[in-house]
């Protein structure tokens, strides 16, 4: 388990992480969310032992990161922001070097290097210098070194930032494969909200170094003003006044062309049956009628901009 208790970090007068506390249990894939400058990377650096906190504590698999640093780090694989590697080294040589640092040798070293290479699909670039690789392959090399020793805990800081859509999909698929059927802990620090819906079982949102929200993606989406909203796709514009007068409706949003209406429900209200009935009574030509689970970006924006949710 990862346990973070009242973790605090200051840089001069600036409080980067402010009394932050949360736990991560085995088997969880945690999305660690926040806008740029929220304190995500600073928290990751403290959690992995690369930055000393000014207050509070953190432990990994029962080992205190300040007093039992090496024991804690042996349990972790860490992909720092930007996936820094030795650019003049070739991929295979770099991974063998990391294996040596991790205490692997002989046949075990070769076996673990081969496993990591296959998992992240690096076979075609083993002989290339890292500095010649695309950003996507550099990120894969960073992932390979992080999983080389088959760690119990995987810490990934902005693993898909700057990648194209295909590269993002590949990295997310790898994260899912690493987490599936295992008791590992995966922590993904990101400001990309689609990452959470794609791979995470739980999300923590921070802002200005403070904890703002903690829950599953479904739980967070349920806090959105779009939770239980009904969206209509119409063949022709329709008058929304009748929708606005329905019981349980708080507002109606219209697209610029008037062909899409989003009917917002009051908290705790289910309005789908009434909206569908009204559309039939008004004889609207409805191409699609759907209920929203909620929008994570709406919750994120409201929390991090200081609005109540």
Task: Please identify what each model-predicted range represents.
Residues 96, 100, 107-125:
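Conserved ABC ATPase "signature" region
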Residues 172-266:
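ABC transporter nucleotide-binding domain
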Residues 150:
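Conserved catalytic motifs of ABC-family nucleotide-binding domains
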Residues 56-67, 71-72:
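Conserved ABC transporter NBD signature motif
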Residues 154-158:
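Catalytic Walker B motif of ABC-type/P-loop ATPase nucleotide-binding domains
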Residues 129-136:
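Conserved ABC ATPase signature
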């Amino acid at each position: 388990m990862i346990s973070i208790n009242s973790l605090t970090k200051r840089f001069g007068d600036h409080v980067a992480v402010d009394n932050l506390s949360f736990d991560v249990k085995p088997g969880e894939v945690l999305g660690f969310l926040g806008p740029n400058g929220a304190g995500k990377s600073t928290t990751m650096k403290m959690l992995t032992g690369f930055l000393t906190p000014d207050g509070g504590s953190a432990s990994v698999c029962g080992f205190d990161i300040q007093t039992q640093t090496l024991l804690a780090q042996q349990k972790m694989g860490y992909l720092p922001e930007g996936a820094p590697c030795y650019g003049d080294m070739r991929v295979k040589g770099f991974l063998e070097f990391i294996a040596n640092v991790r205490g692997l040798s002989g046949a075990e070293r070769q076996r673990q290097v081969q496993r990591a290479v296959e998992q992240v699909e690096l076979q075609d670039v083993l002989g290339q210098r890292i500095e010649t690789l695309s950003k996507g392959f550099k990120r894969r090399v960073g992932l390979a070194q992080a999983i080389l020793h088959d760690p119990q805990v995987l810490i990934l800081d902005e693993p898909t930032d700057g990648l194209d859509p295909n590269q993002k999909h590949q990295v997310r698929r790898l994260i899912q494969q690493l987490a599936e059927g295992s008791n590992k802990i995966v922590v993904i620090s990101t400001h990309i909200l689609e990452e959470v819906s794609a791979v995470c079982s739980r999300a923590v949102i921070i802002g200005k170094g403070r904890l703002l929200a903690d829950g599953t993606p479904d739980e967070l989406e349920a806090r959105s003003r779009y939770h239980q909203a009904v969206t209509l796709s119409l063949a022709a514009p329709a008058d929304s006044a009748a929708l606005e007068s329905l019981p349980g409706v708080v507002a109606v949003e219209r697209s610029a062309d008037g062909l899409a209406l989003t009917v917002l429900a009051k908290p705790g209200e289910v309005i789908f049956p009434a909206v569908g009935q009204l559309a039939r009574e008004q004889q609207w030509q409805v191409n699609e009628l759907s209920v929203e689970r909620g929008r994570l970006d709406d919750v994120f924006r409201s929390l991090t901009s200081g609005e109540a949710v």
